[in-house]
């Protein structure tokens, strides 16, 4: 019985340390995508926010925390997601093949939890996006308009944003943007 307890305790400790690590380190993510694209990553307004445009019309935004991917937004023209989006999601290493198939079937403007990750599918007038973060971090994420606008939001559909990017509160502070008067007036944050 003691041996079984010790084995279970060790397994729980390993799982706990794996969860504490969060998603993939950014350097590993960049390497995972380097076989797919020669395009270079660029910073976008803050040192914790990086952007890649692997093909025309597709933007991959990565928000970092402690050198790891904290949130990913893959934005593309409305309709079926191009291969570059699927490569970006797969390279995270947190979603298995079955989860990626479920994401492909997600309804517009919906969210789900898969493999310990919170996944959202956003639909705008001209742009769609998939957003991914660790499930336990989803309530701490904010939303930033990608095309125009300069306010931070609690909701991805607030103020008619065509495409919203998921970011951490730390990145939001670094950007220095003002809070939206509609959805952040209460001071409550969340995805």
Sequence positions of predicted segments:
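Positively charged n-region of N-terminal signal peptides that target proteins for export
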Residues: 1-8
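Hydrophobic core
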Residues: 9, 13-17
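Short secondary-structure junctions
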Residues: 34-50, 96-109
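Amphipathic N-proximal alpha-helical interface segments
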Residues: 45-79, 111-138
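Long, charged/polar, surface-exposed segments that mediate recognition or autoinhibition
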Residues: 64-107
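Mature, structured domains enriched in cysteine- and short glycine motifs
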Residues: 136-191
């Amino acid at each position: 019985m003691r041996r079984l307890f010790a084995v279970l305790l060790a397994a729980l400790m390993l799982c706990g340390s794996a969860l504490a690590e969060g998603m993939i380190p950014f350097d590993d993510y960049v390497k995972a995508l380097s076989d797919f694209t020669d395009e270079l990553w660029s910073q976008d307004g803050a040192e914790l926010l990086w952007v890649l445009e692997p093909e025309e019309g597709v933007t991959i935004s990565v928000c970092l925390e402690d050198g790891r991917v904290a949130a990913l937004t893959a934005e593309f023209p409305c309709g079926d997601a191009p291969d570059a989006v699927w490569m970006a999601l797969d390279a995270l290493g947190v979603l298995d093949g079955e989860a990626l198939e479920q994401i492909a079937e997600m309804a517009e403007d919906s969210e789900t939890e898969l493999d310990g990750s919170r996944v959202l599918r956003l639909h705008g007038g001209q742009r769609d996006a998939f957003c991914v973060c660790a499930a336990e971090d989803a309530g701490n994420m904010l939303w930033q308009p990608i095309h125009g606008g300069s306010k931070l939001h609690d909701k991805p559909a607030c103020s008619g944003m065509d495409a919203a990017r998921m970011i951490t509160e730390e990145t939001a502070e670094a950007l220095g943007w003002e809070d939206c008067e509609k959805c952040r007036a209460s001071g409550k944050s969340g995805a």
